[in-house]
Amino acid sequence: QEKAIRMLSKYVSSTENPLRSDLYILGVCYFNKGNYSNTVNALSRTVRQNDELTQNAYLYLGQSYLKLGDKNNARMAFEAAATSSFDKQIKEVAMYNYALLIHETAFTGFGESVTIFEDFLNDFPNSQYADKVNDYLVEVYLTTKNYEAALKSINKIKHPSTKILEAKQDILFQLGTQAFANVKLDDAVSLFSQAIQLGSYNMEARNDAYFWRGESYY
């Protein structure tokens, strides 16, 4: 790789319009050597066209910016790679990293990250990252206590995981208790019944729903 870097960097510096493919290879060589500033310098010159090379370059750019501590540019690079569809594996990795950065840098309860996590699970239900995304979503659902928004979010997921369904059962129960407290007893019965009908994902929520549904009938 040292030899490749020497040859390519000499070519790039002596040529007015170096080939994008050569800039890309040079950038990847720099990345593999851990020279992230030079990676950015090389690869940022390759993203002039909408093609597979650009999508790959944006993924490397995102990872390089992360290594350099520049989360804002990393987020934009991952977003660019995630919105391109030439390579689905690149799209998957980029979308996951983009969602994480949105979650870390702009977390305001029910924000953009939840929508991106939903989209990720619908686009890549069998992803190696699916479990982590489910964990992040459940964390947001239960810590923000915005149960109505959480239920709407869960209902958008085509193939919810066991963790998501466990959270859904608790959310239905919590919404039922809110309805009960507001003397909306028909709504409370409906919500408690939905929690019960989900089955045994969350036995505590199910048992509590049975009890409070009985109270709601009186």
What are these regions (language model features)?
Residues 1-218:
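Acidic, polar-rich low-complexity tracts and alpha-helical solenoid repeat scaffolds
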